[in-house]
Regions:
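Short catalytic/ligand-gating loop segments at beta-alpha or beta-beta junctions
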Residues: 187-191
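Alpha/beta enzyme core
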Residues: 2-29, 35-52, 60-183, 194-211, ...
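C-terminal alpha-helical cap/extension of soluble enzyme domains
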Residues: 202-207, 213-247
Length: 247
C-alpha cells in the first residue's frame, strides 16, 4: 500500500468478504507516505472495518529499516538478504529475528532471488536463482525466522513469463516436505488480471504481453505450504486502469 485510496479500496473489498488482511509497505512507500501517516491510515482501517489487520514491511534491505518498523508499531517485517551470500543472509536475518522477537514482532526472510523490479529490488533474469531445498532447512533452523519467501519461478512486475507459465512445483513440494507446517511465501505472484490489462491499454497504456501466474497454480501452491501470496502488481493494475478510465 502507498496511500489512502489504495488502503480504502482494499478495506472495502475485505469488508465485503469479511476477510483478515496483511497490508504490506515497501521501504519506498514508507519514505513517500511517511511512517506516521501510514500508521494512522492503518489505525483508521482497523477502526472502520473491525477486521484483523497486520502491517508488514516488505523487502527491508537492512537491519536499520527493520528496527525502525519494529519500533514504530509494525506487526511484522521482512528482511531481504537474498542479495548477500548464504552465510551473510543467515547472519543478517538472525540479527533481525532476535531483535523483532524480543518486541513480539514476526519476521519473514528470503532465500533465492526473484527476477524483476519492485521498488528498490531489481534482479535481472540471468541473476535469478531458485531456492535450494536443503539450504532452506538450514536457513530456517539457524535463523529462527517465522516464514520464508522462496523462488520457484515467479517474478516481480507484470511480465512474469515469456511463454507458457511454469513454476517448479517439484522444488516447492520438496521444500514443503522438508519443512512441514512451516509458512512459505510467494512473491511476484499476481495473476495480472486480463480485464485490468485491457482497461489500461484501452485508455493509453502499453502493457502488451503482460502475463501473470494463473490462479490454479496459486491454489496448487497453497497445498504445499504456501500461505502468503504477494499481489502488488494486481493492485497497481486495478488502480491504474481506474485512473486512466476516469481521466
Amino acid at each position: 500500500v502507498n496511500n489512502m485510496e489504495i488502503i480504502q479500496g482494499i478495506i472495502e473489498a475485505a469488508k465485503i468478504e469479511q476477510a483478515p488482511l496483511i497490508l504490506q509497505v515497501s521501504a519506498g512507500a514508507r519514505k513517500y507516505a511517511s511512517h506516521i501517516y501510514l500508521m494512522k491510515l492503518v489505525e483508521a482501517a482497523v477502526e472502520d472495518s473491525g477486521l484483523p489487520i497486520c502491517l508488514h514491511l516488505d523487502h527491508g534491505e537492512d537491519f536499520e529499516i527493520c528496527k525502525a518498523c519494529v519500533d514504530g508499531g509494525f506487526t511484522s517485517v521482512m528482511i531481504d538478504g537474498s542479495k548477500h551470500s548464504f552465510e551473510e543472509n543467515i547472519e543478517l536475518t538472525k540479527r533481525v529475528v532476535d531483535y523483532a522477537h524480543n518486541k513480539g514482532v514476526v519476521v519473514e526472510a528470503e532465500l533465492g532471488k526473484l527476477a524483476g523490479v519492485e521498488d528498490a529490488v531489481k534482479v535481472a533474469a540471468a541473476d535469478a536463482t531458485y531456492t535450494d531445498p536443503d539450504q532452506a532447512v538450514e536457513f530456517v533452523e539457524r535463523t529462527g525466522v517465522d516464514s520464508l519467501a522462496i523462488a520457484i519461478g515467479t517474478s516481480h512486475g507484470a511480465y512474469k513469463f515469456k511463454g507458457k507459465p511454469e513454476l517448479d512445483f517439484a522444488r516447492l513440494e520438496k521444500i514443503s516436505n522438508l519443512l512441514p507446517n512451516f509458512p512459505l511465501v510467494l512473491h511476484g505472484a499476481s495473476t495480472v488480471i486480463p480485464s485490468f490489462v485491457e482497461e489500461c491499454n484501452k485508455y493509453g497504456g502499453q502493457l502488451d504481453g503482460a502475463q501473470g501466474v494463473p490462479e490454479d497454480m496459486l491454489l496448487k501452491a497453497g497445498t504445499f505450504g504456501v500461505c502468503k501470496i504477494n499481489i502488488d502488481t494486481d493492485l497497481r493494475l486495478a488502480m491504474t486502469a481506474s485512473v486512466r478510465k476516469h481521466l
